[in-house]
Amino acid sequence: MTKPLPDLRAQWRLPSGALLQPQDVCSLARPQLTRGHYARDFRFFEATLLVVTCGALVVENAVGRWMLEDAGSLLAVAKNTQVNVRKTLADDGAPYTAQFLTFAPALLTEFHQRYGHMLAPASTVEVCQQISLDEGLNDSLQFCIRGIESPDVSELQHTHRALGLLLALQERGIVYSRPSAPGLAERLTQLLAKSPEQPWTAALAGRELAVSEATLRRRLADEGVSFSALLTEIRMHHAMMLLQTTHLGVSQIADACGYRALSRFSMRFRSRFGFSVQDIR
């Protein structure tokens, strides 16, 4: 039987203090905001696990509404889920802080290959699923995070730690779906997300994916995807991440997202999320 978890706020200080750690297995991000904000139609590009360490987070769409406060619970979010997100500061005015892990498709595939016989199809996360953060689950989560943070932990060890966290979630009824074979739109998403600062064109992306520009556009249309819309979506979400997890200036963030004109970047950001870049900072 699991024990309720007491106050965890003091435990959420990672050794290196790094804000963002991309990994082949999973990635760790630590958003921090001194102003609350509301973002519409925010997209989670990968299977995600969220915990709020200070302040509050409300996630909602047509399916449901979920609220996290401090470190009392976790929220599992399915890949490609779109939700409206509201982040608020703590009652005492302390900054909103959170941590979230995104799990790579290769890791989830490995998990299902090893443990798929233990999983019930009805148990998979379809949109969002919330769970109390008990002591045992927190131990698994912290162990995984320390592995991401430590340069001395090999990728193999990190994989085992991440699988251990997925098992701990599975024991509590949380299972992410097994990734399907990626279509062209998914492969393009992965390509663009790796280097959103590059001056991408459909022709250049097609060469990287070994298809002609015409074939790329035709097959994307078959999947209901526009190249320019997807590129903008990836860049805007990358901008949102950088605004919340780094101290980079707005012009630097614009450049990191492939925009040489700050005014065009600012216009795109406001159009996509409904508020200005300055509203976050």
Regions found by a protein language model. Name each.
Residues 132-182:
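An amphipathic alpha-helical interaction segment
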Residues 115-142:
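Aromatic/histidine-rich interaction motifs
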Residues 216, 264-265, 269:
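Short hydrophobic/aromatic patch on the recognition helix
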Residues 222-261, 281:
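Terminal helix-turn-helix DNA-binding modules in bacterial transcription factors
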Residues 207, 255-256, 267, 271:
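Alpha-helical residues within the helix-turn-helix
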Residues 203, 214, 249-251, 262-263:
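Residues within helix-turn-helix
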Residues 23-121:
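N-terminal regulatory/effector-sensing and dimerization cores
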Residues 133-138, 178-200, 208-209, 229-248:
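A short, Lys/Arg-enriched amphipathic alpha-helix from helix-turn-helix/homeodomain DNA-binding modules
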